[in-house]
Amino acid sequence: MAWRGSISKSMKELRILLCQSSPASAPTRTFVEKNYKDLKSLNPKLPILIRECSGVQPQMWARYDMGVERCVNLDGLTEPQILKALENLVKSGATKA
């Protein structure tokens, strides 16, 4: 998982939107609890924003150079699938660099 340390090379910002209580956001909450500290320590200058909003569908947004943004809907994904979605966002940003 060497890609985890290079997130800040391809992304300018990572935003995760989730609901504090909905079952649809449960895997996303678990992902944040298990991975935030590690991701932030590997990418200390990358803004990683966790946005909680009642009733929102879980989503992950990546912002790249020139204001380009990509979104992945996390509804129905498991924690490993969310990690894979993040990896895909990182790799798609690296190909644009």
Curated annotation (Swiss-Prot):
The keyword Mitochondrion applies. SMART domains: L51_S25_CI-B8. The keyword Electron transport applies. Gene3D superfamilies: Glutaredoxin. Disulfide bonds join C19-C53. One of its GO terms (cellular component) is mitochondrion. It is a peripheral membrane protein. Its main location: mitochondrion. Keywords: Disulfide bond, Electron transport, Membrane, Mitochondrion, Mitochondrion inner membrane, Respiratory chain, Transport. It is found in: Mitochondrion inner membrane. Complex I is composed of at least 49 different subunits. Accessory subunit of the mitochondrial membrane respiratory chain NADH dehydrogenase (Complex I), that is believed not to be involved in catalysis. Complex I functions in the transfer of electrons from NADH to the respiratory chain. The immediate electron acceptor for the enzyme is believed to be ubiquinone. Belongs to the complex I NDUFA2 subunit family. This is NADH dehydrogenase [ubiquinone] 1 alpha subcomplex subunit 2. It comes from Arabidopsis thaliana (Mouse-ear cress).
